[in-house]
């Protein structure tokens, strides 16, 4: 028999791995930099130079680039900075991966500690979590009918499928120039820079994927005057960039765009008068784009014939259904108190933050997320001998992102029924978090109020395992066994019975049972009595 099939495109993770590594190294202060007295701030970035697949493994080669802001022992230019890097290479075992496979790598700096060994040497210690995965686009064929059925009895089921329209990785770039206001002096050297994205939003439209939001730029620099004083400048510029995506022209699409900075560089260049007053921002964003569309289809679930024996050949297929796409916000208001040993605050320069998602748990109401917000302050002190100070604090947060279908299912089903349902239909969740807003307000010289809004984007899929007909075997009827069956049967319905299963078992059709019992509906209740008349096609004897 020739089957009618449609193609189902989906994305899956073929293999994944993660590994925690520790980098520990000493770094000598360059000769052109003054001696170190105290480390004020440190920052690290991961750069992957090579990601290579091998048989059953992935090789990562990259660098930890670190920056340090510190106090020096000089009378003029008390604040200085340095930049260095530590290379690393790591092998992650990934079952099933072959050479030339495309591997995606990401990393997270879980801890970065930089200490002073002596005035010309520092120790750098970092704990890094490396992750690799191999995403693949999968294609299945779903059976939706038979071309020439020859009078077969067929049962269909209506279902929604999630059709993958696009899966791609891309980059978008933005270059902006900012001229210092006239009240600010020229730049001799940038000592510290903070570049953070706020209120990030992604939209899918006719022109593709558009990113919007804000880039918060904070710069600590040394002015060109003879005093070598330190200046601070802060501004916000709009983020507006995007990439093309053909799937954006489809109607009723569902999309997920994961955007994260690949690199953010800030340099200074001369203006038209030759003065160092123009800041140049070059921003590169990595985009992980997936686009789906829900489609309602009628799948062929079962088939039999009164003329011959038909044996469907089935294989298991996983269907995905969108359960919820939810954007939630967690608001934090905390108070930071400086230690007694720290310098008092005169003015806050910048407030930087990073958010880490530590655990997610699927509950009866939705997904419970727990994580931490790491907040770092850079401020001007009341002590002219030590003009710049810093403070750091960690705040935990917890948020419940509701899944409406999950709540309704809990209220509708008994616990044992819910457990059975969850075994059959598993919920797959993807949760991303980011800082939407972060601010620091000085209360007094020792206390700062921290306010933050953490964005949590949840995409939940309901997974359903089904049997999909891939082929059919045809055999002649066993007429001897068929003749031994009674021609007339009285049947009392049991739990789980359906007219389809009864008709197939007793060699008749659902329509004949309805007609013989003067019924119009196919719903059976336990204890109902029905009359079954065996039906034998003449062609069966002739064959």
Whereabouts are the PLM-identified features?
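Intrinsically disordered, low-complexity Ser/Thr-rich linker and spacer segments
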Residues: 475-488, 534-543
């Amino acid at each position: 028999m020739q089957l009618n099939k449609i193609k189902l495109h989906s994305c899956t993770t073929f293999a994944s791995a993660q590994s925690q590594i520790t980098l520990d190294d000493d770094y000598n202060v360059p000769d052109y930099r003054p001696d170190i007295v105290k480390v004020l701030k440190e920052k690290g970035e991961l750069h992957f130079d090579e990601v290579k697949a091998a048989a059953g493994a992935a090789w990562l080669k990259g660098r930890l680039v670190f920056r340090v802001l510190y106090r020096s022992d000089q009378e003029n230019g008390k604040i200085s900075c340095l930049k260095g890097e530590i290379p690393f290479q790591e092998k992650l075992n990934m079952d099933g991966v072959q050479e030339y496979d495309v591997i995606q790598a990401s990393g997270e700096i879980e801890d970065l500690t930089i200490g002073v060994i002596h005035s010309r040497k520092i120790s750098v210690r970092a704990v890094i979590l490396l992750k690799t995965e191999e995403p693949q686009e999968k294609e299945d064929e779903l059976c939706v009918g038979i071309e020439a059925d020859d009078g077969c009895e067929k049962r269909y089921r209506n279902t929604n499928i999630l059709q993958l329209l696009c899966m791609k990785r891309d980059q978008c770039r933005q270059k902006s120039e900012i001229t210092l206001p006239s009240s600010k002096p020229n730049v001799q050297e940038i000592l510290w820079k903070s570049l953070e994205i706020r209120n990030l939003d992604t939209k899918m439209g006719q022109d593709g994927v558009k990113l919007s939001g804000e880039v918060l730029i904070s710069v600590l620099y040394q002015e060109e005057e003879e005093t070598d004083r330190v200046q601070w400048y802060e501004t916000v510029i709009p983020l507006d960039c995007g990439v093309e995506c053909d799937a954006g022209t489809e109607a009723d699409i569902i999309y997920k765009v994961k955007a994260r900075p690949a690199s953010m560089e800030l340099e200074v260049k001369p203006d038209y008068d030759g003065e160092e007053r123009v800041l140049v921002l070059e921003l590169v964003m990595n985009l992980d784009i997936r686009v789906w569309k829900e489609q309602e289809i009628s799948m062929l679930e079962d088939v039999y014939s009164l003329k011959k024996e038909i044996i469907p050949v089935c294989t298991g297929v996983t269907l995905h259904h969108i359960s919820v796409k939810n954007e939630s916000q967690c608001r934090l208001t905390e108070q930071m108190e400086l230690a007694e040993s720290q310098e008092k605050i005169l003015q806050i320069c910048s407030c930087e933050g990073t958010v880490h998602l530590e655990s997610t748990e699927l509950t009866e109401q939705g997904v419970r997320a727990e994580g931490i917000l790491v907040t770092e302050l850079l401020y001007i002190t009341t002590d002219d001998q030590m003009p710049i100070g810093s403070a750091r604090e960690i705040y935990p947060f917890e948020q419940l992102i509701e899944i409406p279908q999950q709540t309704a299912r809990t209220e509708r089903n008994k616990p044992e029924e819910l457990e059975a349902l969850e075994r059959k239909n598993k919920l797959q969740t993807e949760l991303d978090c980011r800082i939407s807003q972060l601010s620091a307000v000085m209360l007094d010289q020792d206390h700062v109020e921290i306010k933050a809004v953490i964005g949590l984007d949840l995409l939940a899929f309901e997974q359903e395992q089904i049997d999909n007909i891939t082929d059919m075997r045809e055999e002649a009827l066993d007429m001897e066994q068929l003749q031994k069956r009674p021609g007339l049967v009285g049947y009392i319905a049991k739990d789980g019975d359906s007219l389809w299963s009864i008709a197939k078992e007793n060699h008749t059709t659902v329509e004949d049972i309805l007609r013989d019992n003067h019924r119009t509906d196919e719903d059976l209740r336990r204890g109902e009595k029905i009359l079954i008349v065996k039906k034998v096609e003449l062609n069966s004897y002739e064959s």
